[in-house]
């Protein structure tokens, strides 16, 4: 699941100029689903415009350099959910009682337990009111200083290749790389982990949940996009040159957005 005491020492890969700043989630009703996730995370709700609901910790001012705050944006979309999401959130707990209380509270908010073939595992697999999968982690996982989101999990075919790409695409530190999973985290050692988990299922549809990256102040988005393409990303042309972000896909086709520097 997450890095433990027997993991390799963190490795920092040079030449990085972006950081993970938010998770973007498509929603049929962004306000309603945003309300669920705001309650689940204990975060504040705002909106940058019609069809977009933004979730941030209380008192957060974007773009905040605090790496604990990997925020969540919900964007309205009429597209139906047709497959298991390849990106999901793991929520942190601190005790057996906390895990049980959180599962009960989330169920009361509209979440449902689901079976995706996980078997007998200590974490709880659930779906939000629109069917997006997420997990409530076992309290034994080392999730100190993550905030309510312990891990952002991305399904993949080759965790080692994902660690190479994302370790250079961002300024996050690689904590673990095996044939089964790779784990990164902010170089400051706080905030959620980013895990690439080996799964047998191929990618078949556009991801309903994706990562948003932001270059640092003083950098140029076009230059960063070129650097990411040189690392193995591919450009995605949406036919709209007016949007203030660049859409790319990682080497396994997972879409992500490169936002304006800030």
Regions found by a protein language model. Give the residues of each.
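Glyoxalase I/VOC metalloenzyme domain signal
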Residues: 7-50, 56-115, 127-178, 184-239, ...
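Short, small/polar residue-rich loop motifs at catalytic or cofactor-binding pockets
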Residues: 119-121, 241-243
């Amino acid at each position: 699941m997450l890095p433990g005491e027997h993991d390799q020492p963190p490795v920092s890969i040079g030449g990085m100029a972006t950081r993970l700043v938010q998770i973007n989630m498509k929603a049929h009703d962004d306000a309603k689903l945003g309300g669920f996730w705001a309650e689940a995370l204990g975060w504040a709700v705002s909106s940058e415009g019609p069809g977009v609901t933004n979730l941030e910790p209380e008192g957060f001012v974007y773009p905040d350099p605090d790496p604990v705050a990997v925020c969540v944006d919900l964007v309205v979309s009429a597209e139906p959910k047709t497959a298991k999401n390849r990106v999901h959130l793991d929520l942190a707990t601190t005790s057996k009682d906390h895990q049980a209380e959180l599962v009960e509270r989330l169920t009361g908010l509209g979440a449902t337990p689901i079976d995706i073939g996980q078997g007998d595992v200590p974490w709880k697999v659930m779906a939000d009111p629109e069917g997006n999968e997420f997990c409530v982690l076992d309290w034994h996982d080392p999730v100190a200083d993550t905030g309510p989101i312990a891990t952002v999990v991305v399904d993949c075919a080759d965790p080692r290749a994902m660690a190479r790409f994302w370790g250079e695409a961002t300024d996050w530190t690689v904590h673990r790389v095996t044939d089964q999973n790779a784990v990164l985290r902010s170089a400051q050692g706080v905030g959620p982990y980013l895990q690439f988990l080996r799964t047998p299922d191929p990618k078949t549809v556009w991801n309903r949940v994706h990562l948003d990256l932001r270059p640092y102040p003083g950098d140029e988005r076009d230059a960063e996009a070129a650097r990411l393409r040189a690392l193995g990303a591919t450009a995605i042309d949406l036919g709209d040159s007016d949007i203030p972000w660049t859409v790319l896909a990682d080497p396994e086709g997972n879409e992500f957005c490169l936002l304006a520097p800030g």
